[in-house]
């Protein structure tokens, strides 16, 4: 395989055995594809597909006025250009969005003409607000913050059949129900009650008999019975009856008389139960009719009304029971035949017939009125109102929509073949659902599993945005309808009709404050990717935490390859928030699909298909690890999944095979090496804690990884990836300039790519985003190569933590209960030092008393406090500041107070103005120490710009100019290179001071200035033309870049759009360096977390026989009970990786030959299991580069479920000349004595989590108090106190510490007078206290009084 630029510099030894079938797809595709479909940005009018914005417009337009004389039609839309790019939006705190312009057509019809002749047509583009754009990394910038819209897993529209699991009725009887869920509109439920009648509910209101709905659909009683039942036909023959025989229907009944064939032979004796054998005999005997006594039909139900043949009088109504009287009438009236319903107790219950009997309505109108009364109780029903209401419920496209998904699911469930159809319900649909429900009650068919992923679908960003947009449009529609009637009379234009505010508001609300629009978790690249791939069952139209039961949260067999069974939060959201599996994607209906290889006759093919949970059920699917010989499945029985069960089958039966063992898990879980050896609960913690790792100062790749690290780093967007191949022209810390290869440059494009690197920027979680170049000048890069590392990446691989030398042993109780003992060397080498960036904001407002002013002239502040401020009152970049230091000086006007005569005199003499203003400067918060790394000033239009703002603006303009000049320099250089190759050797006609007939040489060209080249006149016309073209191209380019510069300059110089009343905003960015210290939380990747308890001097740490001390000591007791043995295997393999690195280091120091290096590398990569690496393709220099990068250890990849085996780990340890047990004798650093047994020592990848003691430590002496109770507030953010709670009070009571308790409950808490007195006393040096009445006691008394109880405290 060909290695990319970074891969060949550091090849990972890969232990995977299974063939590589398919690359992991682009990890952010779910977000980007969905939003791209929503916007359809590049599409022309004819290319628009019926999805996204286009579909939303088409569903609401055309809008027709109430009179029908005017209509507003939708023609198309276009998106403008964003005003600012992403970085500017973040800086200015605005939304990254584009204006949406919709072309609409207003048509006015002629009132007079009968056939609607068109009187007037006006077409116009209307502005419909701003639509947020997605950045290329799948996020949105809303008001300057990066947000992610999480996909939602909700119940798919369609029809679902279920039962109550016997919980409703005390008898435990199963009550079946059916529910039709539309995409939007009213829900329709059918349900059985304990007496087996069928009821209907609309939108969960009170229930009505189901027959009411059928009558409202204009079915008569006979039609209803006809639809649901077969009939038995009886012929009346004097005193007996003859039944038209259908033998199957007799099965299971008890014969009440002898059943004989035509010859008189008895087939079934009286009193015997009729069995399948009897039915066969009846079939053979060919009996068509069966004679029976009259009383056989008593109690049966009439299927069609029985009518007197002579008079036409109705003898028995349809759906009534036959009694002795009725039979007598039938005989008397000489009725020849009648029909009864065929029902029995086994598989054909009389449910619908019984329901009709309790139904009080008799015709359509009564049924409609009944439904109207249920939906609108208290309103008087009229025929029209009832009809309109019923029609609008399920049969009007604007109120009800099943959607394409819903229709497909509906038709599949009720057994139709076609998957397309109308979005509204029909009479037939409702009857079909009832039939299916009755069949299920009769024992035919099964209920649905609502947790099956075939019944839950994913709503992505695009779809949710479209829904919100439609909501906005519907609001607009109402307003437009009313204005349309005026449009004809007043000659209005479309612009005057449409008010875009509701649309803009709906979109803004969705992106800004929807439950699924979340502040992006930006701790590290993994947390970003995971957040974008998250699937939540919560949110609007989803579940709520409280109502979600155990079943919804549990892992379902259909999750396999679609949703990760491991990664989900702990706590109340467990199982409701999931993560997409590595290979999963959504199909056009929104169902999750997983890829499989097609297997035919036991042979695996190269064809890969994506299947949803519905399509997969009938397949027999082998695991990715099934043994293959070439392409044939070898084993006699293969472990497979079939019908959502795990079983074994013969190879011939297998139809599909997994593409990779890691398709089961999510990205985060697939980064845990030896995941297969960890308990699931700990793996869950491991995948969650990787997301909390803080990017360290120097990223360090994991020695033991899984091979997924490269994918995550590349797809997360934190690295700089080459857009086009080429040569590095120049590179420094802040940008990379690439001269693009000629064959990748489109005509008219610049042959240069400039990549500006992000330097020391704040992330959402206050961690530091910084990019470092990996390339050198002159390097050749291809498209897709990684050119610069971002936070937590090392040479294009994800690097969340550091490789630490660990020993598993107890050490003087310092690692009791998961504590961690660290070596001081870790601190000295800055292994876990992180940079955090805080943004502090100072806002200058216009107050009632006058504007606040940002200035260095602050009253009552000494010179020392101002020495870090410039003349504008803003701190210098680079200043080191500590708690309480002034960052931005600001004064606020103070209200005029009544002055005493003395003060007036003093002010008259000295002109003292200081008392007019108070100091409201921005100061560094307590407990924060750092360096100012950036200052931004935003000024409202019309306010004068101060010196600092002008300096910042000049600096930014210089940067932009430098970029554009660089771009022009390269374009110019490339153009002249092309000209040089064309001109050298050609003949000149003159110009530029040359004589006619001179042959151009390199020397001549070097002697001319570039501008002079264009003055050359050549003998060949083609060359002259080329010179002209080149000159025109360069002047165009220069013009283009100048325009670009002017545009940027204009943007910089225009005032900022600040909130009302705000004059100026100053943002100061502080970089805070945090070393690891006791109290910080650390973790491995296997859920093994702990808190640093102590940092020991290096000389006291345990060390091996060579004197190498360990970095970290972990407690071995943390492993067995937690069953995360993966960490031990990682430690062993890490030791081998490090040992091999040391051997390579030794070879390089001894300056061995390259051939020896090659041989050793070949042993490592190709002789101990796993994937073979093609080292022969590398040049000697590349082998040396590779070896240099392997000095600190050979990185290994052990993919999940396909990783290194025990024998391979041992072989690696042997190759590194280390003990195969992975254990060694350690010595106590303090005494030098050997420990009593050998210890497991190795290298583990440790993370520092974003739970730092600096953020949690907090102390208060005095501070703010709560308004009502007068007790101190709580929490660090409020600068609150520590709660002395109920149990703590008991403790002091138990000790009898009465005085301590008294001050806790009074002066230290809420005795207002007592605490002020106490403060005074302390100031005066008097340390006595008097306790008064706590304020909370007064609150209690007031509460009791509010209940109407008069309570008073009496003093004795």
Swiss-Prot record:
Its EC number is 2.7.7.6. One of its GO terms (molecular function) is DNA binding. PROSITE patterns: RNA_POL_BETA. GO terms for biological process: DNA-templated transcription. It is an enzyme of class 2 (transferase). It catalyses: RNA(n) + a ribonucleoside 5'-triphosphate = RNA(n+1) + diphosphate. Keywords: DNA-directed RNA polymerase, Nucleotidyltransferase, Transcription, Transferase. InterPro entries: DNA-dir_RNA_pol_bsu_ext_1_sf (IPR042107), DNA-dir_RNA_pol_bsu_external_1 (IPR019462), DNA-dir_RNA_pol_su2 (IPR015712), DNA-dir_RNAP_su2_dom (IPR007120), DNA-dir_RNAP_su2_hyb_sf (IPR037033), RNA_pol_bsu_bac (IPR010243), RNA_pol_bsu_CS (IPR007121), RNA_pol_bsu_protrusion (IPR007644). Transmembrane segments: none annotated. GO terms for cellular component: DNA-directed RNA polymerase complex. DNA-dependent RNA polymerase catalyzes the transcription of DNA into RNA using the four ribonucleoside triphosphates as substrates. HAMAP family: RNApol_bact_RpoB. Belongs to the RNA polymerase beta chain family. The RNAP catalytic core consists of 2 alpha, 1 beta, 1 beta' and 1 omega subunit. When a sigma factor is associated with the core the holoenzyme is formed, which can initiate transcription. This is DNA-directed RNA polymerase subunit beta. It comes from Stutzerimonas stutzeri (strain A1501).
């Amino acid at each position: 395989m060909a290695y990319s630029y970074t891969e060949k510099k550091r090849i990972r030894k890969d232990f995977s055995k299974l063939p590589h079938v398919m690359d992991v797809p682009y990890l952010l595709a779910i977000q980007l594809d969905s939003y791209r479909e929503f916007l359809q940005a590049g599409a022309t009018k004819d290319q628009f597909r019926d999805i996204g914005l286009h579909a939303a417009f088409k569903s609401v337009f055309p809008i027709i006025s109430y009179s029908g004389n005017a209509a507003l039609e939708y023609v198309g839309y276009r998106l403008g250009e964003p005003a600012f790019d992403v970085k500017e939006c973040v800086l200015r705190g605005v939304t990254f969005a584009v204006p949406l312009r919709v072309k609409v057509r207003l048509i006015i019809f002629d009132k007079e003409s009968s056939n609607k002749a068109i009187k007037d047509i006006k077409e116009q583009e209307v502005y419909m607000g701003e639509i947020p754009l997605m950045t290329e990394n799948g996020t949105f910038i809303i008001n300057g913050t990066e947000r992610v819209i999480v996909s939602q897993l909700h119940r798919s529209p369609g029809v679902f059949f279920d039962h109550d699991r016997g919980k409703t009725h005390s008898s435990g009887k199963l009550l079946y129900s059916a529910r039709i869920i539309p995409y939007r509109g009213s829900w329709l439920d059918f349900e059985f009650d304990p007496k087996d009648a069928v009821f209907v509910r609309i939108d969960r209101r009170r229930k009505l008999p189901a027959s009411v709905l059928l009558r409202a659909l204009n079915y008569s009683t006979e039609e209803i019975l006809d639809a649901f039942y077969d009939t038995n036909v009886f012929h009346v023959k004097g005193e007996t009856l003859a039944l038209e025989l259908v033998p199957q229907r007799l099965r299971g009944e008890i014969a009440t008389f002898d059943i004989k064939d035509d010859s008189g032979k008895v087939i079934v004796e009286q009193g015997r139960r009729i069995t399948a054998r009897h039915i066969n005999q009846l079939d053979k005997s060919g009996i068509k009719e069966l004679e029976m006594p009259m009383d056989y039909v008593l109690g049966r139900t009439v299927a069609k009304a029985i009518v007197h043949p002579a008079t036409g009088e109705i003898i028995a109504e349809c759906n009534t029971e036959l009694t002795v009287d009725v039979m007598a009438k039938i005989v008397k009236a000489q009725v020849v035949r009648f029909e009864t319903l065929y029902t029995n107790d086994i598989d054909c219950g009389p449910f619908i017939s019984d329901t009709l009997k309790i139904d009080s309505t008799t015709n359509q109108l009564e049924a409609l009125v009944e439904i109207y009364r249920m939906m609108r109780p208290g309103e008087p029903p009229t025929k029209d109102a009832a009809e309109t209401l019923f029609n609008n419920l399920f049969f009007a496209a604007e109120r009800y929509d099943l959607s394409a998904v819903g229709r497909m699911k509906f038709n599949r469930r009720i057994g139709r073949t076609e998957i397309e159809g109308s979005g509204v319900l029909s009479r037939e649909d409702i009857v079909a659902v009832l039939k299916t429900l009755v069949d299920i009650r009769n024992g035919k068919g099964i209920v649905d599993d609502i947790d099956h992923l075939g019944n839950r679908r994913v709503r992505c960003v695009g779809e949710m945005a479209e829904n919100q947009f439609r909501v906005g449009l519907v609001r607009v529609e109402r307003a437009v309808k009313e204005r349309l009637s005026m449009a004809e009379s007043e000659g209005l234009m479309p612009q005057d009709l449409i008010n875009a505010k509701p649309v803009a508001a709906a979109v803004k609300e969705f992106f800004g404050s929807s439950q699924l629009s979340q502040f992006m978790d930006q701790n590290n690249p993994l947390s970003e990717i995971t957040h974008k791939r998250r699937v939540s069952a919560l949110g609007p139209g989803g579940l709520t935490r409280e109502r979600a039961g155990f079943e919804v949260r549990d892992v379902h067999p259909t999750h396999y390859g679609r949703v990760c069974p491991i990664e989900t939060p702990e706590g109340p959201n467990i199982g409701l928030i999931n993560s997409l599996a590595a290979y999963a994607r959504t199909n056009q209906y929104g169902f999750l699909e997983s890829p499989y290889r097609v297997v035919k006759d036991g042979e695996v093919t190269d064809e890969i298909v994506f299947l949803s949970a519905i399509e997969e059920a009938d397949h027999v699917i082998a695991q990715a690890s099934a043994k293959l010989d070439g392409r044939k499945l070898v084993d006699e029985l293969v472990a497979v999944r079939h019908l959502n069960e795990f079983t074994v089958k013969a190879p011939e039966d297998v139809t599909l095979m997994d593409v990779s063992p890691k398709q089961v898990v999510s990205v985060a879980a697939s980064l845990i090496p030896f995941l297969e050896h960890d308990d699931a609960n700990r793996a869950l913690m491991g995948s969650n804690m990787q997301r909390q790792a803080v990017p360290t100062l120097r990223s360090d790749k994991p020695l033991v990884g899984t091979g997924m690290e490269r994918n995550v780093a590349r797809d997360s967007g934190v690295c700089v990836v080459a857009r086009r191949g080429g040569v590095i022209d120049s590179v420094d810390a802040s940008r990379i300039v690439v001269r693009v290869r000629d064959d990748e440059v489109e005509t008219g494009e610049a042959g240069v790519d400039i990549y500006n690197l992000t330097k020391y920027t704040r992330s959402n979680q206050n961690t530091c985003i910084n990019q470092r170049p990996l390339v050198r000048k002159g390097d050749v890069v291809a498209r897709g190569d990684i050119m610069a590392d971002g936070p937590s990446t090392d040479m294009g691989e994800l690097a969340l933590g550091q490789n630490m030398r660990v020993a598993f042993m107890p050490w003087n109780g310092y690692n009791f209960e998961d504590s961690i003992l660290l070596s001081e060397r870790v601190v000295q080498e800055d292994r876990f030092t992180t940079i955090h960036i805080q943004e502090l904001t100072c806002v200058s407002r216009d107050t009632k008393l006058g504007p606040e002013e940002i200035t260095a002239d602050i009253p009552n502040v000494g010179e020392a406090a101002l020495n870090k401020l410039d003349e504008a009152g803003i701190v210098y970049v680079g200043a080191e500041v500590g708690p309480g230091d002034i960052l931005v000086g600001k004064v606020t006007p103070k209200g005029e107070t009544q002055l005493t005569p003395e003060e007036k005199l003093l002010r008259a003499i000295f002109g003292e103005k200081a008392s007019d203003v108070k100091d409201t400067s921005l100061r560094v918060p307590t407990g924060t120490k750092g360096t100012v790394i950036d200052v931004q000033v935003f000024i409202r239009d019309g306010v004068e710009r101060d010196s600092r703002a002008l300096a910042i603006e000049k600096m930014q303009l210089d940067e932009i100019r430098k970029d554009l000049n660089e771009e022009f320099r390269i374009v110019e250089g490339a153009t002249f290179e092309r000209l040089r190759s064309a001109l050298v050797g050609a003949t000149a006609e003159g110009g530029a001071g040359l004589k006619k007939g001179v042959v151009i040489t390199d020397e001549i060209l070097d002697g001319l200035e570039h501008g002079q080249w264009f003055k050359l006149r050549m003998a060949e016309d083609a060359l002259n033309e080329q010179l002209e073209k080149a000159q025109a191209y360069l002047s165009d380019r220069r013009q283009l870049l100048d325009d670009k510069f002017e545009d940027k300059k204009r943007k910089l110089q225009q005032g900022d759009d600040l909130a009302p009343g705000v004059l100026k905003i100053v943002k100061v960015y502080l970089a805070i360096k945090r070393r690891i210290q006791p109290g910080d939380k650390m973790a491995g990747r296997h859920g093994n977390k702990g808190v640093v308890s102590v940092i020991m001097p290096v000389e006291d740490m345990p060390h091996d026989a060579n004197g190498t001390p360990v970095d970290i000591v972990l407690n071995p007791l943390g492993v067995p009970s937690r069953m995360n043995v993966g960490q031990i295997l990682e430690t062993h393999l890490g030791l081998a990786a490090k040992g091999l690195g040391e051997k390579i280091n030794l070879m390089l120091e001894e300056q061995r030959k390259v051939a020896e290096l090659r041989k050793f590398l070949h042993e490592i990569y190709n002789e101990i299991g796993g994937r073979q690496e093609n080292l022969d393709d590398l040049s000697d220099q590349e082998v040396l580069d590779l070896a240099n990068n392997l000095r600190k250890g050979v990185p290994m990849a052990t993919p999940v479920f396909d990783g290194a085996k025990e024998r391979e780990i041992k072989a690696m340890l042997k190759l590194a000349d280390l003990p195969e047990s992975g254990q060694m004798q350690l010595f106590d650093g303090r005494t030098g004595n050997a420990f009593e047994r050998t210890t497991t020592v190795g290298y583990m990848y440790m993370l520092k989590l974003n739970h730092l003691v600096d953020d949690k430590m907090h102390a208060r002496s005095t501070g703010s108090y709560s308004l009502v109770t007068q007790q101190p507030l709580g929490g660090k953010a409020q600068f609150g106190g520590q709660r002395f709670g109920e149990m703590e009070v008991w403790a002091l009571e138990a000790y009898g510490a009465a005085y301590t308790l008294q001050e806790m409950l009074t002066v230290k808490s809420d005795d207002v007078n007592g605490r002020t007195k106490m403060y005074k006393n302390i100031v005066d040096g008097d340390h006595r206290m008097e306790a008064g009445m706590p304020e909370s006691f007064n609150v209690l008394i007031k509460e009791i009084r509010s209940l109407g109880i008069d309570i008073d405290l009496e003093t004795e």
